[in-house]
Amino acid sequence: MPLPGGLWWLLCCRRGFTLLHRDYGDGELSGDGDEDEDDETFELRTPSPAGGGRGSLDVTLTQPTRNGPISDRLQGWEETWSLIPDKGLPEEDPDIIVKGWLYREPRGGGARPWLLPRRAWFVLTRDSLDQFSSSGKGARRLGSLVLTSLCSVTGPERRPKETGLWSVTVSGRKHSIRLCSPRQAEAERWGVALREVIASKAPLETPTQLLLRDIQESCGDPEAVALIYRRNPILRHTSSALYAPLLPLPYEVSAPGPGYAPLREEAVRLFLALQALEGARRPGPLMQGVLQTCRDLPALQDELFLQLAKQTSGPAGPPGLPATQDPATLRYWQLLTCMSCTFRPGGAVRGHLLGHLERTEQALPDSELAEYARFIRKALGRTRGRELVPSLAEISALSRRQELLCTVHCPGAGACPVSIDSHTTAGEVARELVGRLGLARSRNAFALYEQRGAQERALAGGTLVADVLTRFENLTSEEAGLEDSPDCGWRLCLRLHGPLHPEGLSPEGHELPFLFEQAHALLLRGRPPPPEDTLRALAALRLQSLHRDFSPRGPLPLLDRLLPPPIPPREQPPCPTRRPPPSAALLAGALWSPGLAKRRAERARRGGTGRSTGSTAQVGGGGASTTAAVLGGWKRLRGMGQAEAMAAYLALAAQCPGFGAARYDVLELSTEPGGGAPQKLCLGLGAKAMSLSRPGETEPIHSVSYGHVAACQLIGPHTLALRVGDSQLLLQSPQVEEIMELVNAYLANPSPERPCRSGSSSGPPSQDLPDTSPPSQHQVLEEPQGQSGCLKQLQD
């Protein structure tokens, strides 16, 4: 029976469809022996086994060009067959590692589901992956894939919507092969074997790496270096495209990250972005995008360093004499400056880059290019890892080789401008401001904080301020479209870090007003909420320090600037009894404060008296009785000087329970096997004790003085270990470094009220407990045992 005409036409034109797909399709096929691949001039070479030196290159390595039609390109199977002798299936070859029947999925099988996987006999040796028509003697070889150190293997993974088989993808220089098997164990066996063969291969080198080695060996002979540049255009500036990366990058089919192409394709795109810099009206965002790509794909950092060294060498070789003042020429140097302040180049690339900069300085000592070269050399010596790429303001400053100006807000001193560079740390800025304000001999410790409204977080001493400014810029751009964005954005501020020492403050220095303003800011945010009489006394002292003696002719003060905002009363339903966290059994006993149970029993006996008092204290923000009480206390302070009022304010505020306590959201990890899931808790660090409480609760569940803390150390990226006696508490938080620094600061600062670390004593008194609950949920804490003379004077 004759076949239908349409089927005859399909069979006869199958070869024609393949050629059309090769010429006008995606450029790469993965059929049985019909793979079409791009021709590349850059051959990869294996280093000589003897190692060491090589003779000078006699051949000229040029940038690959595409002059002929696409149909004239070499086919992948022709290239691989030229490397392997044409022979049949080997018999008992000792180099065979794995062999067996597998399915090979045609390229584009997901897009063309009618192309079914083809079954073939695969043999893996130490040099290649071969495909045969059968497993018998004399079987015809259908194709080969040469395995090098740059090949990559992905999988196994199952594709239920396509083939339903387990697949392993092997990516080579020209094409990739997807091996399929119905059994997962077999796919895993092939994947492991392929990875072991690739890992055993010697690393390959590109011609660019060989030329870099020649330049390094001839660095003492300028004429030899110039000759290498003249004979090899790949090292010089070019206006044409780059079709292959300068460094050996792994062959991959899958993208290394969301929004990115494979590494080799991204390297070519980077070079196109560099060339786009020459005509860009706003080069800053384009530079930032290039830096972000290198930040997301670290394998491209050395590649970009080499591309910039190539483009800054000039068409005739280094140092690039033509049009040194041309902005298009300088933009390569500006991007290289940003790169040197963000990333650290590898060994060979770093040596070549330093040599390139040195040759530029020697050839053009008084030019602007030499200034850029000197700036970059200094930056390479100081650069370490960056968390974020430079901000647009930093890129603009680096393009002019200038420092960046940042503003730090200091209580009592206003905004202080500080000049920083890409390597300045938060500790260096804090030390500079401490010295500028005359606080170097103070007993109090200070640190740099990032602040936004009531949110604040201490910066570790080694944090780069440039990264913090970049984060502020990103947050500002994200919140630009929000309608309910806050009035004040993120800012840097200098504040007290650790325990407060109000005694012995000089009335003439900056420390007294500094601490005075910071204490007032903490009280306005409800940290901590003092009793009603203490609040009124503090308000009167602040009025005396700001306006001196009371005058009936003056305007009435605004109490909302003197007292914390009122808390709306609400009924709290009785909460059920919760299961205690692991720390209840772990840190129970004499180490934890026994005063907690006594205070709970006392408050239960009084039956909510403290809560009503707290409402009175907080609601008194604008009442007539509160205003009269504050004004009455202000009148009784007549004759008190400004410095004396500030000192009395600090002394009274320091007696408030939990004054200056820092709070952190943590996860408590169980130290017992099978102890359960981590529990969310709130860690409070006060001047004399630390406490743990549940989120939203005002009463701490545990408290321990610093004298009982034996050690505080990091045991993981976000895990902190606190050793209390013979027990250990594990806490997890993204701010573990800040917590550890603050705890160690308290541990290194003994005081007469705090028990010694080596001694044993009872828990801290009530005012030593840190405050760990949100400001809107505070109850009034008990009045401190001792009151200053100023408070007694106000109550008389």
Swiss-Prot record:
Domain MyTH4: 237-399
Ranges annotated as biased composition (Acidic residues): 29-41
InterPro entries: Actin_motor_Myosin (IPR051724), Band_41_domain (IPR019749), FERM/acyl-CoA-bd_prot_sf (IPR014352), FERM_2 (IPR035963), FERM_central (IPR019748), FERM_domain (IPR000299), MyTH4_dom (IPR000857), MyTH4_dom_sf (IPR038185)
PANTHER family, sorted: AGAP003327-PA, PLECKSTRIN HOMOLOGY DOMAIN-CONTAINING FAMILY H MEMBER 3
Gene: Plekhh3
Omega-N-methylarginine modification, residue list: 638
Residues found modified as Phosphoserine: 30
Protein name in UniProt: Pleckstrin homology domain-containing family H member 3
Entry annotated with the keyword Phosphoprotein: yes
